[in-house]
Amino acid sequence: MDALDAISKWLAKQHVVTYCVGNGEALWCANAFYLYDRERVAFYLLSDTESRHGKMAGKLAPVAGTVNGQTKTVALIRGVQFSGELRLVEEPESEALRERYNRRFPVARVMSSPLWEIRLDEIKFTDNTLGFGKKLVWLRAEQA
């Protein structure tokens, strides 16, 4: 199993991402439920454009963040750190993605917030179940 396969398998089992954006003067982080797309190596999430992080991001922004489990046992720690690009997904592109998101999180059907994409460009996965401090790294730039 290559690094992206192992990372993707774990990410597909999680559901909350913490992501951070900045505007040159300040940084702000937010949490969201996400849908992971293995083919695009991207997260899809809902967030209001009028939120603090939505205003900072505009329609396109650099982003960094984490996805982590909640174990209390050091030997079982697993988590992802990432960097990439946050983009507001416009219609009609957002329609099929939004339907997939709604299937995973049915409560989202009543939410009017738009869909965003976090395109992952660098992923570092720490997986202590493979040995203490074991890291798997994936870089989009190396895939071209």
Curated annotation (Swiss-Prot):
It comes from the Bacteria. Gene3D superfamilies: Electron Transport, Fmn-binding Protein, Chain A (2.30.110.10). InterPro entries: Split_barrel_FMN-bd, UPF0306. Belongs to the UPF0306 family. This is UPF0306 protein ESA_03544.
